[in-house]
């Protein structure tokens, strides 16, 4: 399985870059031999791609190289990879072909719930995000077996130190890498994170104790059809704002640490393209010049201060829609529910063309790469 990313419109480019993403686990066996790496890199070069994105830290928190901080993934689904410098070979071959190569890290995740595998199952269960569910109350995310990615609470200081050390180690180990891209640098969803630590840090942020937690954030209720929905509490909007600030602060710190090792390396981020509901994961990837409070009820007037597009050298999004054009979308108005969404969404944001047009607006002219799954 290969995840290609095609480019959206940009300004001041003679030739638009085109990125091809190689997922770690989907391609674990396929890319376990140098001649296979040669074959696929040669192929994407002939197809006109300019960049390859190599996933080096999948969701279980293992990495695809030898590390003093993270366990190395040497086996997946019963297949054991031969012992060679996978990342080093990929970098060398890509550069021989004139391709840029960027390494992708899944950031705030450390386990695979379908396999009970990963660092939050083995060494750091305390890092697991605590989620507030409609039917089971508050519990660790590792107990939600319908959710494959076991996410981590983004604000834990010891985890932030851990993941930043991984970035620094990787860039030092592979100085020829052209850039890194942060993936899953977010909360799991609207249900995260409701740990005691998050409560205390949020109380510090608003300068008062929460009388009724978690219901002062939101309370699960049922609508007329019997479906659960989060009824907003008195602190809901500040909670949404605070989560966006947390992710912004981490992005700022991560960039600082990365650039301290190599000032010329590209610092990039991948997100979903569905901005109207992406607040659910605590991410404001817009430009600071865009004020979402003028369009969306979930945004405070301060929310715009935590737009992080200006921090990035490279920004890529997933436009994962089966409807391509706005014209086709308007014929049927399909309801769309993306991986991070709590409920179904509707509007021209939820087709490939529409999302790209809307992204241009909120990014204030900054370039982005619009992605498709193939």
Task: Annotate each language-model stretch with its function.
Residues 47-83, 330-333:
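Aromatic-lined carbohydrate-binding/catalytic grooves of carbohydrate-active enzymes
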């Amino acid at each position: 399985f290969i995840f290609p990313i095609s480019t959206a419109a940009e300004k001041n480019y003679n030739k638009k870059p085109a990125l091809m993403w190689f997922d770690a686990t989907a391609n674990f066996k396929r890319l376990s031999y140098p001649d296979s790496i040669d074959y696929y890199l040669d192929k994407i070069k002939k197809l006109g791609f300019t960049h390859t994105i190599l996933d080096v830290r999948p969701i279980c928190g293992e990495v695809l190289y030898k590390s003093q901080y993270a366990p190395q993934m040497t086996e997946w689904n019963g297949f054991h990879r031969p012992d060679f410098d996978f990342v080093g070979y990929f970098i060398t071959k890509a550069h021989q072909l004139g391709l840029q190569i960027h390494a992708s890290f899944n950031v705030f995740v450390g386990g695979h719930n379908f396999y009970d595998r990963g660092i939050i199952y083995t060494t750091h269960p305390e890092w697991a995000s605590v989620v507030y569910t409609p039917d089971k109350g508050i519990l660790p995310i590792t107990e939600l077996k319908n959710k494959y990615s076991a996410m981590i609470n983004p604000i834990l200081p010891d985890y932030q130190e851990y993941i930043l050390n991984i970035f620094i180690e990787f860039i030092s180990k592979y100085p020829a890498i052209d850039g890194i891209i942060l993936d899953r640098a977010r909360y799991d969803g609207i249900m995260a994170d409701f740990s005691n630590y998050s409560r205390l840090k949020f109380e510090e942020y608003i300068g008062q104790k929460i009388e009724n937690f978690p219901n002062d954030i939101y309370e699960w209720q049922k609508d007329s059809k019997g479906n659960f929905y989060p009824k907003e509490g008195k602190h809901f909007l500040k909670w949404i704002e605070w989560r966006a600030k947390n992710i912004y602060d981490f992005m700022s710190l991560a960039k600082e640490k990365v650039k301290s090792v190599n000032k010329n390396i590209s610092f990039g981020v991948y997100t979903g393209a569905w901005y109207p509901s992406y607040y659910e994961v605590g991410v404001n990837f817009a430009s600071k010049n865009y004020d979402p409070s003028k369009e969306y009820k979930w945004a405070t007037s301060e929310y715009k201060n935590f737009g992080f597009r200006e921090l990035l050298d490279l920004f890529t999004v997933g436009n994962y829609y089966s409807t391509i054009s706005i014209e086709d979308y308007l014929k049927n108005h399909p309801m769309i529910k993306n991986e991070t969404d709590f409920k179904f969404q509707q509007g021209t944001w939820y087709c490939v063309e529409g999302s790209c047009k809307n992204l241009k607006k909120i990014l204030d002219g900054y370039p982005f790469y619009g992605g498709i799954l193939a």
